[in-house]
Swiss-Prot record:
Sequence segments annotated as region (NADPHX 2): 383-389
Annotated positions binding (6S)-NADPHX 2: 333, 447
Binding site for ADP: 417-421, 437-446
Domain YjeF C-terminal intervals: 231-508
Family per similarity comment: In the N-terminal section; belongs to the NnrE/AIBP family.
Stretches the record annotates as NADPHX 1: 66-70, 131-137
Name of the featured protein: Bifunctional NAD(P)H-hydrate repair enzyme Nnr
Amino acid sequence: MAVTSPWFRAVVSAAQMQEIENWLFTQGMPVAALMEKAALQTAQRLLTLYPLSTYPRIGVVVGPGHNGGDGLVVARELKLQGYQVQVLQPLDKLKPLTQNHVDYGKSLGIPWVDGVQALAHCDLIIDALFGVGLTRLITGAIADLITTINNLPIPVVSIDLPSGIETDTGEILGVAVEADRSFCLGLWKRAYFQDRALAHLGQTELLGIGLPPQAIANVLGEVWPVQVLGADQAQQTLPLSRPLVTHKYQQGHLLLICGSQQYAGGALLTTLGARASGVGMVTVAVPMGIKALLHSQCPEVLVKGLLETPSGAIAGLGNLDLSRYSAVALGPGLGSDVGPLVEEVLSVNCPLILDADGLNQLAQQQLLPLLAVRTAPTVLTPHGGEFKRLFPDIDQGDRLTAVQTAAAMCQATVLLKGAKTVIASPTGPTWAIKDSTPALARGGSGDVLTGLMGGILAQPEKFDLAQRVATAAWWHAQAGILASQQRTILGVDAQHLAEYLIPACRQWLGPNVANWPANLSHSS
């Protein structure tokens, strides 16, 4: 079976991971061999990150299953490298393979300790209690053990997943280890993209364990159902190369409908995001009262002044010809007193992005069913509160399932904003944005994203719409990360975020930036 995506992009459930492993075992791979591969990769990474000179004393907390077995192999390897290792095994009943590693570890002289306080003098604690697949609540002595570990002033590394986190939903099963670092083994697990798990994961890293591509494809198919978007995909998705002979109208024409007297900045920030996308033309439709502001701040865009309500919001689109544009984005800064704009734009025969007050109007006027009959694609970009108003019956606890359910329900591409933004469409894979920054938790950040996304969707298509939406979210996050590195988390206001979009692009393109066509023949 052909494989179209590198293994490190796949995101799997506990059941899918178990099925992949079972396929390996039916093909003849010993369970012990897979455990050795996973644990040796973990041990090697620990040797790099936690050198003997700084972290000589290691405590390993092991559970009854194969996660505990992984921990015991790690304990063995660290012992052989000169670390002072001790093991805490709070449960007596073990799987046979795990028991084998207990016996071997004791034969090497690794000490077993009886209580968590015996680990208080350690320099590092390794959590190998439960890992992937746990579904029951943690109570009693084990809950007390985890609470004590969390209260110790010692760094904790979890193997595969912090103990106490449900693998698929990220739910905290009563109590969970608060790791400083988590090594995800083999393939990303869904919990790594659930906001409610993030406080327990710490820094995250995927460790390859040599899973054959055919094993993954046998379970997930040729295209992974849930994928992490990476820099290489973003680069391929963006229209970075252009024909030698081109002009602005061939590079897309984006219409932004946004802004009000109260939220004039929303229109400006959306425009700044669009400007960075490379789209050929941008038209901004705003209330007449803020038209001059847009002209003065963004002289290269076309500004349409629209009739406004007494409070300074857009009253209606008037004679605006929606057929002229290759994408339309509506919502940022419109305010609550805006006219019935959403119903007016639903007829556009091009990608339509609804954000902010556009989403609120969609919910208030119960227009969601109309999206299913649109002939052109629709993109909804809610944060958690807007999502609840649009889809009150969908539980957001499991964000991946929630966004997939919403996309299927309304037949639109849905981007659910959060610390881990996720994107789903009615067909095709669900995308997850792995890296972001809390610096983006600022007013106007979403406006910049809407403009950037609109500019990308307005340009000639290279990949499916959901992947282009995900690329906009990924680029937006990378700009936030770069800006926070240079300005600190406190210094990333939305205007500066927009200014970092192109520097972020140059950074992840690296040497390839020199390969962009530098001498394009064009007409303005």
